[in-house]
């Protein structure tokens, strides 16, 4: 296997992009099929194994070397495994596609994690931050607090 640092020094026109191993459903001796994000498992591109490197820090990821101005045929396999070229994307376009996927993923995760938290709003022009409750809930809370006395 080629050392990643040696390859980068020689080829400045290459972006080494980290992806999850889940994007590589199958591999041959010479190449690996890499899925496009947000597409079915039968749409992607073939990349020579010379451009795929194991991650030293993250065992669930690999680095793929994409040449910015190279044209990669995006293939789509039908149910009979017949190969059809769907379109061509440059290395830059593929990088942008994976970046968009990552950004969407993190946005969805943030919403999923923090959606249930009540939003804080300023009320009655004072400096107290109150949760965004209805008037009924506020009255119920006040009554509950008064009943404690």
UniProtKB/Swiss-Prot annotation:
Belongs to the plectrovirus ORF4 family. This is Uncharacterized protein ORF4. It holds the Pfam family DUF3627. It comes from the Viruses. InterPro entries: DUF3627 (IPR022549).
